[in-house]
Amino acid sequence: MCVCQTMEVGQYGKNASRAGDRGVLLEPFIHQVGGHSSMMRYDDHTVCKPLISREQRFYESLPPEMKEFTPEYKGVVSVCFEGDSDGYINLVAYPYVESETVEQDDTPEREQPRRKHSRRSLHRSGSGSDHKEEKASLSFETSESSQETKSPKVELHSHSDVPFQMLDSNSGLSSEKISYNPWSLRCHKQQLSRMRSESKDRKLYKFLLLENVVHHFKYPCVLDLKMGTRQHGDDASAEKAARQMRKCEQSTSASLGVRVCGMQVYQLDTGHYLCRNKYYGRGLSIEGFRNALYQYLHNGLDLRRDLFEPILSKLRGLKAVLERQASYRFYSSSLLVIYDGKECRSELRLKHVDMGLPEVPPLCGPSTSPSNTSLEAGPSSPPKVDVRMIDFAHSTFKGFRDDPTVHDGPDRGYVFGLENLISIMEQMRDENQ
């Protein structure tokens, strides 16, 4: 289906999916909760997304103090369609070679990377992490209708062990329980349709390799927040700028500098992920935003009060870093807040509920595990949380790519959003002590 040079991709981990001896079969990243570009799983520790030159350059130019708050940039791969023996078309990644003719998402920007990337970034690595639920394969059937630009038929060959359930606009549960975040599937279908409609000449596509920031979490609860009071880049057309400004004015982006773009939260009482998408987030009032944040921190049994300080500490640290980044603008960037939905304390709490016991033990320490028969917890330890900035396709700073517009001072719209997010979380913490 496409012509690629025969190259050795490298050592495959035990969780790798191979496409012949040369390529890596890309799988859907089932924990994608927002965005419009499809994220694909490359291996346990790595995801990939369609390359946009500005975003690639931005990752290569990140200030060192921002790297704690962004996914690690791992390089570039070439991606193309390939057919299998069952008549399905899959996305397969190959090592990127600079001499290849490759397509990327930002049509006006076709320049090649300024440097070659180490082969380390092209090796498919495995791990011993508990991510069996992420092993899914996305493909679509070839048929007479496959030349149409409508959404392809998608078949997921394996699924998450934890069902996902979308919340409707009335805050009620949908009847459908599926094995992947519904927004993830939507993005995959749209991405495949775009690529298929552009693939008449069997072109290769460039994809960025990035750290999978949820790979540390067994049951990742993810909140995707669109940050800032402005979303359009300096190079946006007047029409697009007006459209983005309307979205901001009609949402909490204008009033708070932040709006919900997507969410999944694990519910201990049902064993499901509850999901929200960007359309829900756009319609929220300030009070609605507060309620959404409360819902994100609630596991179906309790408000996770133990999460307040770890998350607030991360947010304050990020705010301090961004206040020092003069001329930087992160238009249309998102912020991911992540925690584990089934840590030791949570499982002990569920045991107490099942046994009718009133007290919840303190946080678990190294000496305690959910499998212990005793319900006594060891020394307390803070829960694992993470905060990461993503999506830099419209970011800029002084001297970046000779951008004609240069801004003064830090990104005040982004910082404004962080200040309000911190304030709302502090109020919620104080009200629920």
UniProtKB/Swiss-Prot annotation:
The lineage of its organism: Eukaryota, Metazoa, Chordata, Craniata, Vertebrata. Residues 113-123 have a biased composition (Basic residues). GO terms for molecular function: ATP binding; inositol hexakisphosphate 5-kinase activity; inositol hexakisphosphate kinase activity. The keyword Ligase does not apply. The modification Phosphoserine is found at residue 151. Residues 150-160 have a biased composition (Basic and acidic residues). Its EC number is 2.7.4.21. Converts inositol hexakisphosphate (InsP6) to diphosphoinositol pentakisphosphate (InsP7/PP-InsP5). Converts 1,3,4,5,6-pentakisphosphate (InsP5) to PP-InsP4. This is Inositol hexakisphosphate kinase 1. It catalyses: 1D-myo-inositol hexakisphosphate + ATP = 5-diphospho-1D-myo-inositol 1,2,3,4,6-pentakisphosphate + ADP; 1-diphospho-1D-myo-inositol 2,3,4,5,6-pentakisphosphate + ATP + H(+) = 1,5-bis(diphospho)-1D-myo-inositol 2,3,4,6-tetrakisphosphate + ADP. GO terms for biological process: inositol phosphate biosynthetic process; negative regulation of cold-induced thermogenesis; phosphatidylinositol phosphate biosynthetic process. The keyword ATP-binding applies. Residues 100-160, 362-383 are annotated as: Disordered. Belongs to the inositol phosphokinase (IPK) family. One of its GO terms (cellular component) is cytosol. It is an enzyme of class 2 (transferase). It comes from the Eukaryota. It is found in: Cytoplasm; Nucleus. It comes from Rattus norvegicus. Keywords: ATP-binding, Cytoplasm, Kinase, Nucleotide-binding, Nucleus, Phosphoprotein, Transferase.
